[in-house]
């Protein structure tokens, strides 16, 4: 069996095209959607992610205000900037690129963002609303996974979903979304304390790999015909590349393609969907703040 490759880049491009039409409509009413992006330090991966996000914003007609702060920035300095952006009515969303330098507590930073501008969906208020099924900003990567499944026609009702990874950014919120009535899957979340992991993953109709370990999920951990969603983005050394590295996922891709019925690649799988959902959340924020919903 050769798995269908789920083209996240194409689906994300279609979504951005739809968003661009909505942006034109609200710009005609005098609203310019704007996202504040804060990058602390010079981490190359973070710089690359920020570039991808700002490029997507510009593509759909949104503005960004990017703040590049030195590695030595203190927590108080960052919180002061966030307070100013919270009060700025021309800023619809605030994104602080993670990870942050060790002297800054990421939880304190996330909690400082106005929940109405929390387009990442990480603020405790928005996490609570998500858990209760209330309307809120949905974390971008989990939302992107759900959108991919729906757009590719994957049947989720009654499906056994196994998520490997329990992070606050992906695993936990995705488990909630999978249980929602519009998805209606039966969910198992695996982690470092899970016993007999392969026995669990081989039960999955839909297997989501989100633990941040390169090629951790092997072909013998996948049920024949399962749909595999690879959330991982890992840099591994590759002397043949100009950059000196290449990106791989949490799934051992080529062997998995012989077992799965469909699979997301890395790159051009879940990653573009994450950015598209960030852009979508920024549009929602701009509409809400200007009474245009």
Curated annotation (Swiss-Prot):
One of its GO terms (biological process) is methionine biosynthetic process. NADP(+) binds at residues 165-167, 192, 233. Coiled coil: none annotated. Catalyzes the oxidation of 5,10-methylenetetrahydrofolate to 5,10-methenyltetrahydrofolate and then the hydrolysis of 5,10-methenyltetrahydrofolate to 10-formyltetrahydrofolate. Belongs to the tetrahydrofolate dehydrogenase/cyclohydrolase family. Pathway: One-carbon metabolism; tetrahydrofolate interconversion. It catalyses: (6R)-5,10-methylene-5,6,7,8-tetrahydrofolate + NADP(+) = (6R)-5,10-methenyltetrahydrofolate + NADPH; (6R)-5,10-methenyltetrahydrofolate + H2O = (6R)-10-formyltetrahydrofolate + H(+). This is Bifunctional protein FolD.
């Amino acid at each position: 069996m050769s798995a269908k490759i789920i083209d996240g880049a194409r689906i994300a491009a279609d979504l951005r095209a739809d968003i661009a039409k909505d942006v034109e409509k609200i710009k005609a009413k005098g609203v310019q959607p704007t996202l504040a992006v804060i990058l602390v330090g010079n981490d190359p991966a973070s710089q690359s992610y920020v570039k991808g996000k700002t490029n997507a914003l510009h593509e759909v007609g949104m503005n960004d205000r990017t703040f590049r702060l030195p590695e030595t920035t203190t927590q108080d300095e960052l919180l002061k900037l966030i307070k100013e952006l919270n009060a700025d009515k021309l800023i619809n969303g605030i994104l602080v690129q993670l990870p942050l330098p060790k002297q800054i507590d990421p939880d304190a930073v996330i909690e400082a963002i106005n929940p109405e501008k929390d387009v990442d969906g990480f603020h405790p208020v928005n996490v609570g609303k998500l858990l209760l099924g209330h309307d809120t900003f949905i974390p971008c990567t989990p939302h992107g996974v759900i959108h991919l499944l729906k757009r590719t026609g994957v049947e989720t009702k009654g499906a056994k979903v196994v998520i490997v990874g329990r992070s606050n950014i992906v695993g936990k919120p995705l488990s909630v979304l999978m249980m929602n009535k519009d998805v209606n899957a039966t969910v198992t979340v695996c982690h470092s304390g899970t016993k007999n992991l392969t026995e669990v993953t081989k039960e999955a109709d839909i297997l989501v790999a989100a633990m941040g370990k390169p090629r951790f999920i092997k072909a013998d951990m996948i049920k024949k015909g399962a749909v595999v969603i690879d959330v991982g983005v890992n840099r591994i050394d590759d002397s043949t590349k100009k950059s000196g590295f290449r990106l791989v996922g949490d799934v051992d891709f080529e062997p998995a393609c012989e077992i799965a019925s469909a699979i997301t690649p890395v790159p051009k799988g879940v990653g573009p969907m994450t950015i598209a959902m960030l852009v979508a959340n920024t549009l929602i924020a701009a509409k809400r703040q200007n009474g245009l919903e």
